[in-house]
């Protein structure tokens, strides 16, 4: 008979005895061998065994050692933590006592909050009123007056032509703040393609002294010389404007008012961006600026700026596209015939400015990219510089202008303004501002160097108002009856140079959207939406009674005029004539390029006539109607 489990002597057991009390009160420990027979463990095995001898005895438990190690480690951590806490506490107490001592010694110590921005090391020159002389009035408005003048630095025998912008005596604190903000922005820039501030005079009325641009603004310049401007000039201007705007973007400045009227011509080869009355400086962590109101140029603004008053560097790109369109159409008005209040809906429906007749698809596509609804889809200014620089190396490939290779700008010495300048002042020792300031980057006390007189270096100034976009003939554009060359080509592949002059030339249109005589012409715009009646017909149209300020000398585009004026405001406008000394003709403050209540289907009555001090900070379009900035409802 065999046991089912183990054999312990004569007995069958389920398990070998383990710790059973035996003889002499000793514990008996047994283990099962290979035959399932219980055998006694070695006498020294006091906790059982797994085999014969001492080798079968179990090892001692490691649990106490592990527990001891864990407890010891925790104690060490607690001690180290207490030590660190005491150290930090003592350091905090020392710092607190130090700050308390500094506060007692210096009365106030502001906490340090570094922004990471580079310091603005621009110099603001404070000029004495005796250092400059006002020569003649260039223009005036509700905010003040702009003079042509001469800056004669103290202790030097040079004269620098300048424009002096002076606020009125009874100017509001807000207007003073706006002109000082403008001075801050202009003093912070230093670029060949951005107009610079020469100084500020803090008399009873604040005065800004800026560079005087002898050729006036670019809009006026291209309108006057449209028959002599070739493709190379147009593309070079596009490059220079893009360079100026790229510089402003690098300085985190949003211009908000880029247009051809706000680009000044120093020489036909050199243009500069001006009018920083609306410009805003973004902080290091800001990417957009939210405007609260003010006068805004609706037809040059991006859609997000019109609808939400959001201004970014990419909204400046949109304005740049419209500015390029102005250049390529030789001063045409964007969206002519469309009321400013409808611009947002027109843009939302996908309509854009038409392709100028002289532009190839390459140039027009750049404009279209600038007018994308998605701001991030628009090109950057550095990309625009690269594109137009490439085109400027081969102008006839991208702009098709008849007789392009024979075009040259007329001698500026024939201009009326140049002759007036010569007659009015002793022009000896006249020096250009840029040339004068080169050796004076530090300040005014550096020694004078040899300079080239302005009259010999600048062969002239234009017959424009020196710093203003003048609307000639009271129409906002010149009338050139002797223009006989058909300059526009709708088909870039056509060889119009082979046509004979004797075949009969039609007068070139003054604007792309102007109707031509009965004979078909390639100068007509293909998009009929923008076609307009002839210049003569425009001047004969009666003003719509729905709009205010309908002077005979006002801009004949009533849909742009401010309808949100109280009777008081209307009376002030209609009874406030402004005169230009040179032309002696009356003008109006209304300007169609800027509107007040530009949000769709929204009008809020405003009983106050408000023309901000920054209406045109640089040169104030002298003969141009002055409603270009119409107040935007907050």
Swiss-Prot record:
| Protein kinase domain ranges (all copies) | 132-399
Query: Would the keyword ATP-binding be found if you checked this record's keyword annotation?
Result: yes
Q: Which residues bind ATP?
A: 138-146, 165
- Domain of life assignment: Viruses
GO terms for cellular component: plasma membrane; receptor complex
| Enzyme Commission number, as recorded | 2.7.10.1
According to the record, the segments passing through the membrane are: none
Known InterPro entries for this protein? Egfr_JX_dom, GF_recep_IV, Growth_fac_rcpt_cys_sf, Kinase-like_dom_sf, Prot_kinase_dom, Protein_kinase_ATP_BS, RTK, Ser-Thr/Tyr_kinase_cat_dom
What does the record list as coiled-coil region(s)?
none
Q: Between which residues do disulfide bridges form?
A: none
What PROSITE patterns does this protein's entry cite?
Answer: PROTEIN_KINASE_ATP, PROTEIN_KINASE_DOM, PROTEIN_KINASE_TYR
Q: Quote one Gene Ontology molecular function term.
A: epidermal growth factor receptor activity
Is Cell membrane set as a keyword in this record? Answer: no
Provide this UniProt record's keywords sorted from A to Z: ATP-binding, Kinase, Nucleotide-binding, Oncogene, Phosphoprotein, Transferase, Tyrosine-protein kinase
Name the chemical reaction catalysed here: L-tyrosyl-[protein] + ATP = O-phospho-L-tyrosyl-[protein] + ADP + H(+)
Biological process, per Gene Ontology? negative regulation of apoptotic process; positive regulation of epithelial cell proliferation
The residues annotated as the active site are 257
The UniProt record's further free-text remark is: This protein is produced by erythroleukemia cells in chickens which have been injected with the avian leukosis virus and subsequently develop leukemia. The leukemias are induced by the insertion of retroviral promoter elements in or near the c-erbB gene, which leads to c-erbB activation.
Into which family does the record put it? Belongs to the protein kinase superfamily. Tyr protein kinase family. EGF receptor subfamily.
Name of the protein:
Tyrosine-protein kinase transforming protein erbB
Give the species this sequence originates from.
Answer: Avian leukosis virus
Q: Which gene encodes it?
A: V-ERBB
């Amino acid at each position: 008979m065999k046991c089912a489990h183990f054999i312990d002597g004569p007995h069958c057991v389920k398990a070998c005895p383990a710790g059973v009390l035996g003889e002499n009160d000793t514990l008996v420990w047994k283990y099962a061998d290979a035959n399932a027979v219980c055998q006694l463990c070695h006498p020294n095995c006091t906790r059982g065994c797994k085999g014969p001898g001492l080798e079968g005895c179990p090892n001692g438990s490691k649990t106490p050692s592990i527990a001891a190690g864990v407890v010891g480690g925790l104690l060490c951590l607690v001690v180290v933590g207490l030590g660190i806490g005491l150290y930090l506490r003592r350091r905090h107490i020392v710092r607190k006592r130090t700050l308390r001592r500094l506060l007692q010694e210096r009365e106030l110590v502001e906490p340090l909050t570094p922004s990471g921005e580079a310091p603005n090391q621009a110099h603001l020159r404070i000029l004495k009123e005796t250092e400059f002389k006002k020569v003649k009035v260039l223009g005036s408005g509700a905010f003040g007056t702009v003079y042509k003048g001469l800056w004669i630095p103290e202790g030097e025998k040079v004269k620098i032509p300048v424009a002096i912008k002076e606020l009125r005596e009874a100017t509001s604190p807000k207007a003073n703040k706006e002109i000082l903000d403008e001075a801050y922005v202009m003093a912070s820039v230093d670029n060949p393609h951005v107009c610079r501030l020469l100084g500020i005079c803090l008399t009873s009325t604040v005065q800004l002294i800026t560079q005087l641009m002898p050729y006036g603004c670019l809009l006026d310049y291209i309108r006057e010389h449209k028959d002599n401007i070739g493709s190379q000039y147009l593309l070079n201007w596009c490059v220079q404007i893009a360079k100026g705007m790229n510089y402003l973007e690098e300085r985190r400045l949003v211009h908000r008012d880029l247009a051809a009227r706000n680009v000044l011509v120093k020489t036909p080869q050199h243009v500069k961006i001006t009018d920083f009355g609306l410009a805003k400086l973004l902080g290091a962590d800001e990417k957009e600026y939210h405007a609260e109101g003010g006068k805004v140029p609706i037809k040059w603004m991006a859609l997000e700026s019109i609808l939400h008053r959001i201004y970014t560097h990419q909204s400046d790109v949109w304005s740049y596209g419209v500015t390029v369109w102005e250049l390529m159409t030789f001063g045409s008005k964007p969206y002519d015939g469309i009321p400013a209040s409808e611009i947002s809906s027109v843009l939302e429906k996908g309509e854009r400015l038409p392709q100028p007749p002289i532009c190839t698809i390459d140039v027009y596509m750049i404009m279209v990219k600038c007018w994308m609804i998605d701001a991030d889809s628009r090109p950057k200014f550095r990309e625009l510089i690269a594109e137009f620089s490439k085109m400027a190396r081969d102008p006839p490939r991208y702009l098709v202008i008849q007789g392009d290779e024979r075009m040259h700008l007329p001698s500026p010495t024939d201009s009326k303004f140049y002759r007036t300048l010569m007659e009015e002042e002793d022009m000896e020792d006249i020096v250009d501002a840029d040339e004068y300031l080169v050796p004076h980057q530090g300040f005014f006390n550096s020694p004078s160097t040899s300079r080239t007189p302005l009259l010999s270096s600048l062969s002239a100034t234009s017959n424009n108002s020196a710093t203003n976009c003048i609307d000639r003939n009271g129409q906002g554009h010149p009338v050139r009856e002797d223009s006989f060359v058909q300059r526009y080509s709708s088909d870039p592949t056509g060889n119009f140079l082979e046509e004979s002059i004797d075949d009969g030339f039609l007068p070139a249109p003054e604007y792309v959207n102007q109707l031509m005589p009965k004979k078909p012409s390639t100068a007509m715009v293909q998009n009929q939406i923008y076609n307009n009646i002839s210049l003569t017909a425009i001047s004969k149209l009666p003003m719509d009674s729905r709009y205010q300020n309908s002077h005979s000398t006002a801009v004949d585009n009533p849909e742009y005029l401010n309808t949100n004026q109280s009777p008081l405001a209307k009376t002030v406008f209609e009874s406030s004539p402004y005169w230009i000394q040179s032309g002696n003709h009356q003008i109006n403050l209304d300007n169609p390029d800027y509107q007040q209540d530009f949000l769709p289907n929204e009008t809020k009555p405003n009983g106050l006539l408000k023309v901000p001090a920054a209406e045109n900070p640089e040169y104030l379009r002298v003969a141009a109607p002055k409603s270009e900035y119409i107040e935007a409802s907050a």
